[in-house]
Amino acid sequence: MHFVKAKGILSAKNGMNLYRGCSHGCIYCDSRSNCYHMEHAFEDIEVKENAIELLKDALTRKRKKCMIGTGSMTDPYIPLEMKLGNVRKALELVYEYGFGFTVITKSNRILRDLDLLQKINEKTKCVVQMTLTTCDEDLCRKIEPNVSTTEERFEVLKTLRDCGIPTVVWLSPVLPFINDTEENISGILDMCAEAKAYGVICFGMGLTLREGNREYFYEQLDRLFPGVKEQYIRTYGDQYMMESGNSQKLMRLFHRKCEKYGIVHDNDQIFRYLSAFEEKDDGGQLSIWD
């Protein structure tokens, strides 16, 4: 862990990352890619020491309320968060100033902040996004070793459902030769249906590899799945997008099951939903802002 002084905190689309780097150890993580210009070891978490001060200033200056997001680059609920509490402080500001909130995570540590998530959702809108990659617990522990298992995340989704907090699931990535099976996709969607997820984001059945994360991913394949790296190299070479050989069949299954369960599966529609700010008046009615 090391501290830096940040110049700003909110992106043009009102996203923020309170930390840079991660200790969850997911073998496929795109954030390891060199294009993000991280000048420190990925596991050496960079903490923006003035993030909360910057966020307060940014929120007070905004003329129009909107959704504030976090988690696109670094999961905010890393173990360090339980010590520093920056996400909770940010949530308190979001609630105080009447903004909406959405977060992407793989961790059940988010339940620490359930009270604030509920308060935000009662006042405006709060959406929790959670990544699910496999319904096989043993496989999950291999490819995502230091974070909540799929079953634990499923329990979080059901808890949020029971509290009236909407959820969106990212079905990503689908690793060729590892979790690209009908059984896996079907199992994940069954979980989404039971948890009453609003939607499932899926950009296709495959994964992307770039300089930086490719090397790490291949090292982990050698360690965990001997021989699979060679399958990747033979099949895909240096391609950026590595689409599963089962892609078309799996995408048909994905859309069919989402239709059956009434789960939104149009990515554009989901992103519009995530970015739409909703303010609840005293009568429980919604005012929706783009």
Regions found by a protein language model. Give the residues of each.
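Conserved Radical SAM active-site core
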Residues: M1-Q129, T133-R141, T150-F154
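Auxiliary Fe-S-binding modules of radical SAM enzymes
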Residues: M1-K5, E183-D290
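Surface-exposed amphipathic alpha-helices with a cationic face
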Residues: Q118-N121, F154-D162, H255, E259
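Conserved strand-turn element in the central/C-terminal portion of the radical SAM core barrel
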Residues: C135-E137, E144-N146, T159-T181, G204-L207
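Acidic-and-aromatic substrate-binding clefts and catalytic sites of carbohydrate-active enzymes
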Residues: V47, R109-L111, P176-N179, T208
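Short, electropositive alpha-helical surface patch
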Residues: L84-G85, Q118-M130, N179-K196, L221-L224
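A structural motif
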Residues: G98-F99, I165, A197
